[in-house]
C-alpha cells in the first residue's frame, strides 16, 4: 500500500511537503520492523496491530510498504475491515530532520522537508493526503487521508535544520538557510508553543500522554489541563470484590509491561500450564528439561525489561496458572480453600488488594509500574465567585504537589520440604502461591503502618508528623470516635472511603462497650463503628485506633515476582528455601485524611 506522497499538507506552521527524492528518506527505522498501528496509538499495548515487512520508494515519488497483520483480536477486526474496503486510509509517523522554506503566499509559508525519518505506519479513520492509502495505484487521487505529524509530540515535530549546500528546489540552486518558521508579530506562535510544551511536559511527567495530546489539540489552557490531570488520576474507593472487567485505575492500564505477559506473545492458555513447583525443582537441580516453558517465560521477561533475575522471573499471572479447573469452592475438605476460578491478568492486583487490610479498607493498587512515579495532589482549593452578568472571573491560582512512589523490595522466605517438592497436586501449588501472596500482603500492611523510613522501608503512617490525633485515658468510646470523625471531616475528605482500623484486642473491647448507658447499643457492631466499616488486625499496636479515608492510600507494584532457591539452609533434610522478591511502595496522598487515637501513658 502507498503510505506517503508529495501532497502538500496544512500544518500549524504552514504548508508542508515531504520530499520523495532519492536520499531524502532515512530508512533505518522503517526497514527494521517498524510497527503497524491503529490510529497512531503508540502507548497502549494493544495499539500495535502488525509490522512493516518491506518499505521502498516507487517511481511515482511515493513511499510504499508491505505489512503483516497480527493475529490478535484487535488486529483481526481491523484486517476484516481492510479486506471489506471499509478501512482505506493510511498515515505515517515521521521525524523531520531537515526543512527548507520554499516560498511565501501572503502570510502562508510553504516548506519542503528534505530529510525525514518515517518510524510507524497507521491505519486511520480520518487523515489529510488524498493520494495514498490501501490499494491505491499511481493514477488514483481520491478518498484517502494521511495525517502527518499531528499525532506526534511537538519536540519530534519541530526539529529542523538548514538545507544542505547544493540542494535545489524547482531546479534552481538555493543558498543554505536557517530560517524555518515565520514568527507572528504579536508573539502568538511563541505563546502557543509554550502552552503546548507545558501541557506535554505535564502529560509526560504523570504518564498521561494521550490526555495531554487531546488537551493541546482542543486548546485547553495549562491551568485547565492541570485540573483535568488531577481528576484523571484521583484515586476512587474500589469495591472489595471488583467485577471481571474492572481495574483499580483504568488510566494505568498502559503501564503494565512488567505484569502483563500478553505483550510477550504468551496467552492465558499458555500460562495455565505454568507450574511453580516445576520452576522450583528446576532451579534446585539446574535441570530445566521439565521446566522449559517456565524458563522461556523468565527469559522473555528478562529480555523485555533489560534486567537479570536472581533465579527466575515469575509473572503475576503465573500465580493463577493451573487454577482454571473448576472444583467445588468454599469447601475446605475438598480443596475449595485452595481453588480459584478463571484466570485474569489483573488477579494478582485484586487478590493482593483483598489480602491486605489496607486494600480491604479501600486503598488503591497501582500495578505494572516502571521507575519512580509522581502522583499529583492538589494543595489548595480553587476560588469561586458570584459575578455580574458581564463580569469576568478573576484568575484562580491552584497549588499542586506530588506524592513520590519508588520501588522498595519486599523479600520473603518459604520453606519447602523434600516431600512437598515431589508433589504434583494442584492444591500443593496453590498452597505455595497462597503463602507467597499472604507474605507480600502482610509485609505491605506493616510497612505502611509502622515502616521506619530507613533500610529501604516506607515511612509508616504511625511515625509521620502532621497527622491529627487524640489520646484517651481508659477506654476508647463514643466520644473519641466522634472526635476522630470530626477531625477528618474538617479536612473535606470524601466519606466514601472512610473506615476504622484497630487491634484485635480493641475490637473485642469495642464489642463490650456501650455507646451510652442504658441504650444497649454497642460501639462495635456488625463490623461497623458509628456507621463506618471497621476492621481489626494484629499488625496494629494494642491500644491504637486509626480513622480516615483509606482511598487516599496508594499501594504501588513494580515488575514481576523474582524467585531464588536457597538449598544450603535446609541441605541436611534435602529441603529448600524459596526466596521471593517483589518491588512495592505505599504512601498516602493526604495525611490530613487520617486521625490516630492512642491510649495515654499513665
Curated annotation (Swiss-Prot):
Biased composition (Polar residues): 157-167
Ranges annotated as biased composition (Basic and acidic residues): 170-191
Subcellular location field: Virion
Gene Ontology CC, one term: viral capsid
UniProt cross-references to Gene3D superfamilies, sorted A to Z: Major capsid protein gp5
Record keywords, A-Z: Capsid protein, Late protein, Virion
Entry keyword Metal-binding: no
Function: Assembles to form an icosahedral capsid.
Name assigned to this protein: Major capsid protein
Amino acid at each position: 500500500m502507498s503510505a506517503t506522497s508529495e501532497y502538500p499538507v496544512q500544518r500549524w506552521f504552514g504548508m508542508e511537503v515531504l520530499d520523495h527524492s532519492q536520499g531524502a528518506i532515512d530508512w533505518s527505522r522503517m526497514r527494521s520492523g517498524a510497527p503497524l498501528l491503529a490510529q497512531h496509538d503508540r502507548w497502549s499495548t494493544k495499539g500495535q496491530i502488525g509490522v512493516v515487512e518491506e518499505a521502498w520508494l516507487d517511481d511515482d515519488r511515493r513511499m510504499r510498504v508491505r505489512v503483516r497483520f497480527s493475529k490478535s483480536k484487535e488486529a483481526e477486526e481491523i484486517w476484516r475491515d481492510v479486506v471489506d474496503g471499509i478501512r482505506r486510509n493510511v498515515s505515517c509517523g515521521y521525524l523531520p530532520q531537515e526543512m527548507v522554506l520554499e516560498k511565501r503566499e501572503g502570510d502562508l509559508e510553504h516548506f519542503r522537508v528534505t530529510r525525514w525519518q518515517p518510524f510507524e505506519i497507521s491505519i486511520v479513520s480520518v487523515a489529510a493526503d488524498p493520494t495514498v492509502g490501501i490499494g491505491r495505484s499511481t493514477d488514483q487521487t481520491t478518498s484517502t487521508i494521511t495525517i502527518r505529524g499531528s499525532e506526534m509530540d511537538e519536540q519530534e515535530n519541530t526539529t529542523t535544520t538548514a538545507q544542505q549546500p547544493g540542494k535545489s528546489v524547482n531546479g534552481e540552486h538555493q543558498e543554505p538557510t536557517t530560517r524555518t518558521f515565520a514568527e507572528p508579530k504579536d508573539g502568538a506562535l511563541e505563546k502557543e508553543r509554550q502552552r503546548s510544551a507545558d501541557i506535554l511536559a505535564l502529560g509526560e511527567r504523570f504518564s498521561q500522554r494521550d490526555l495531554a495530546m487531546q488537551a493541546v489539540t482542543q486548546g485547553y489552557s495549562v491551568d485547565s489541563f492541570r485540573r483535568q490531570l488531577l481528576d484523571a488520576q484521583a484515586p476512587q474507593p474500589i469495591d472489595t470484590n471488583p467485577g471481571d472487567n474492572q481495574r483499580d485505575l483504568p488510566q494505568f492500564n498502559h503501564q503494565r509491561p512488567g505484569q502483563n505477559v500478553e505483550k510477550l506473545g504468551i496467552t492465558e492458555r499458555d500460562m495455565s500450564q505454568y507450574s511453580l513447583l516445576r520452576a522450583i525443582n528446576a532451579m534446585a537441580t539446574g535441570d530445566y528439561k521439565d521446566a522449559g516453558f517456565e524458563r522461556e517465560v523468565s527469559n522473555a521477561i528478562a529480555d523485555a525489561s533489560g534486567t537479570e533475575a536472581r533465579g527466575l522471573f515469575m509473572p503475576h499471572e503465573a500465580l493463577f496458572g493451573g487454577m482454571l479447573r473448576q472444583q467445588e469452592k468454599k469447601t475446605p475438605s475438598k480443596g475449595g480453600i485452595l481453588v480459584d476460578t478463571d484466570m485474569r491478568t489483573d488477579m494478582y492486583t485484586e487478590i493482593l488488594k483483598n489480602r491486605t487490610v489496607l486494600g480491604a479498607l479501600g486503598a488503591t493498587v497501582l500495578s505494572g509500574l516502571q521507575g519512580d512515579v509522581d502522583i499529583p495532589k492538589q494543595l489548595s482549593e480553587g476560588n469561586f465567585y458570584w459575578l455580574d452578568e458581564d463580569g469576568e472571573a478573576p484568575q484562580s491560582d491552584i497549588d499542586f504537589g506530588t506524592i513520590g512512589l519508588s520501588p522498595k523490595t519486599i523479600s520473603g522466605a518459604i520453606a519447602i520440604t523434600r516431600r512437598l517438592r515431589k508433589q504434583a497436586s494442584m492444591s500443593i501449588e496453590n498452597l505455595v502461591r497462597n503463602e507467597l501472596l499472604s507474605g507480600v500482603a502482610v509485609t505491605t500492611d506493616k510497612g505502611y503502618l509502622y515502616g521506619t523510613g530507613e533500610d529501604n522501608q516506607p515511612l509508616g503512617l504511625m511515625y509521620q508528623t502532621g497527622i491529627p490525633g487524640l489520646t484517651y485515658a481508659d477506654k476508647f468510646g463514643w466520644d473519641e470516635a466522634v472526635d476522630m470523625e470530626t477531625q477528618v471531616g474538617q479536612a473535606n475528605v470524601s466519606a466514601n472511603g472512610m473506615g476504622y482500623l484497630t487491634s484485635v484486642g480493641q475490637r473485642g473491647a469495642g464489642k463490650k462497650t456501650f455507646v451510652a448507658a442504658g441504650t444497649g447499643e454497642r460501639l462495635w457492631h456488625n463490623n461497623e463503628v458509628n456507621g463506618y466499616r471497621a476492621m481489626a488486625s494484629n499488625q496494629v499496636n494494642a491500644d491504637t485506633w486509626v480513622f480516615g479515608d483509606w482511598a487516599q492510600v496508594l499501594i504501588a507494584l513494580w515488575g514481576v515476582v523474582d524467585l531464588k532457591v536457597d538449598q544450603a539452609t535446609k541441605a541436611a533434610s534435602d529441603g529448600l528455601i524459596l526466596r521471593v522478591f517483589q518491588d512495592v511502595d505505599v504512601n498516602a496522598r493526604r495525611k490530613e485524611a487520617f486521625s490516630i487515637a492512642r491510649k495515654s501513658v499513665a
